[in-house]
Amino acid sequence: MHERARLHGQLTPILRRLAAGILAAWLAAAVADEPPASALGAQVMQTSTKRPRIGLVLGGGGAKGAAHIGIIKVLEEMRVPIDCIAGTSMGSIVGAAYATGLSAAELEKLMTGVNWLDTLASAPRQEIPLHRKSRDFLFPKGLEFGWKDGKLVAPGGLVPTHQIEDLFRRIVAGAAQVPDFDHLPIPFRAVATDLESGEMVVFDRGELAVAMRASMAVPAAFAPVEANGRLLVDGMLVRNLPVDVARNTCADVVIAVQVAAPAATREQLASFLGVAGQAMNIAVAANERAQVATLTDRDVRIRVVLEDVSSADFSKVPETIPIGEAAARAAAASLARYSLSAAAYAEWRADLDKLAAPPKLPIDEIRVTGLRATSPDVVRAQLESKPGDVYDPAKARADADRLVARGDYTAVSYGIASERAGVNVLAFNATEKPWGPEYVNFDLNLSTDFKGDTQWGIRLDYEKRWINSLGGEFRSSVQLGSPNAFAAQFYQPLDVAQRFFVAPVVYANQRLSYLYHGDDALGQYDTRRVGASLDVGAALAPWGEVRLGILREDVDAKPKTGDVLLPDPGRHALGALAARFAYDSVDKALFPTEGVRATASAYSFKPWLGSDRQYETVAFDGTATKTWQKNVWQLTLRGGSDLGSHAPFYDQFRAGGLFNFSGYRYEQLVGREFFLTSVLYRRRAVFLNETLGTAIYSGVSLEVGNVYRRLDGTSASGVLFGGALFLAVDSKVGPIYLAYGRSEGGHSALYLYLGSSIELYQR
């Protein structure tokens, strides 16, 4: 019990990260591959012949399936013993956990403590290599397509699965050394569907967490699971209520728990999503009815109806458990036939095989399997687990998370096995993305201040990874709109640990900018840049890197409209030495709740590098984010200077726009020096759709700073105060902001932002 309590104490904070959209499903079950009726577990074989053997059948139902915990609570109260369990989808998750020896109280604590929304997210962003993190800002929707044979390839599922499977692995950690499900404290079966043949697949052995993942792999929501040469999805499609599976496992008597929802109304069927959902419900109900028809008077059927909980409402899991309890109590008379005396029930509980804590085994070998495009040497260099160490599941889990965060795998499983006498192998099995290693991304962004200044862009990004054994990758991006831009980079690690790298870059952009004198827009000027750079750098960790480089650039700036007098128009050649540092530990790109993101840069433009001007610039931009309860606070510090070297107007610092001197128009303030300090507060106001992870935030920012030595010659001294009020939506189509900004001197603006406002390439 102490070991179990310790285990659950470790599990609880991680369990907060499971899946909000975990399914969008209605779970059913399958049609073939049934185990022989003789496949009885060792524990079942020892069951007293004085009573019938009881099989518990837990049907699918997504979030509604958490009601099974309430059923189990009543079974324990009434002292009804369970000799085997068969489950589908959510029923397999609850059933597997109970089969490993967890009590109903422990199950309730675990399931209600899970943060389902976070668990459906990708691996922790903090572990993503820094050179890949910029994609999160440019393409915030999180959708990624592959490119194979000249065609777009969509991912196998919309929801990442690594954290889900890893959660299951930790829930049933005690079963890691139990490959035969008959040897669990309560023999167990999980039902899945063979996606190719449509047959039912019954898991009676293997890795329990994989069986759970396969049983709840809702098509399209989650990628199929490849196991034993089969491509598997949710068991709901063929056997949502696996009564026959329980009978073939052990059951003389079946307690079948069916999770149901009220019939759909005409209004709910008005959309294509409603129609698709109802079509699935009809198919699931048909295979359920076939199983219900096999129940006899000796069996007990418990039907749990949840009026206001959908299959995807994981935030309502705590509400489902009392409903399950009520349904079980309504069947108390039928259940009472199988109730044991207090002494007999205590004896049954005591006789259950207890899962011993996994032994502390030394690691003799480390093996990585499942690799096709990626390099085993590079992968092994990322692992903290080493031969000679004592196996540490937490360290192995961190290794797996780190590998998945790199972006090449959908999931990485891990575990230790004794393949030969006295030889313990720590095996990592990586599932490479079937749609990789070439990727394509799209994005659309739009911003306006409703005063005629509108920025927009359509972005396309192509990336090819693992060009060579050290992990070289090529990436090119193009944007049409304002500005028009193109950038291409070849990122080449120099060692298997990928600590050092070289990165040649070519880029070009063209943009129209307003030239202001005070508050008056005099007209527009056109700036075109074409350049190339070569960086050498060191990756400090996933959170940071330093780069030293050299660049050459041609700039052509000329008036476009209005009465624009530029101080030095025309074409200019630039050449510079560059030093840059970047740090990024935020948990989310555009709506972070924790972490720090900062960049610092220094450029020295020299005639001997081909520059027709000599000057220097230094800049810093950093934001720290902290969450207290539901309140998110962000502190931002920005600043830059030309160190008195008189930088030309096209390389001076620009400010103005939302959260960047809110109240001023976009890039209204241009000068050779600036600083800005701001404090931003936001709070989630509404959860729009937990499955998609969308929410509405309200917030406020307070800003202080100024731009000095301005291009327009206006005087600037002291500091300017300002701020903004905003509503923001974190949606699958990207961030959406509606805001009102005001700054000292009566400057105000109304803003609408759709998508990412981050520029495609910034040197």
Give the location of each predicted region.
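C-terminal outer-membrane beta-barrel translocator/porin domains of Gram-negative envelope proteins
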Residues: 425-427, 439-449, 563-570, 574-696, ...
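Gram-negative/organellar outer-membrane beta-barrel architecture
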Residues: 394, 411-579, 586, 653-659, ...
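Envelope-exposed proteins and targeting segments
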Residues: 52-54, 78, 184-188, 208, ...
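Solvent-exposed coil/turn segments that connect beta secondary-structure elements
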Residues: 103, 112, 193-196, 206-208, ...
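Bacterial N-terminal signal peptides that target proteins for export
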Residues: 2-19
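Hydrophobic helical h-region of N-terminal Sec-dependent signal peptides
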Residues: 19-31
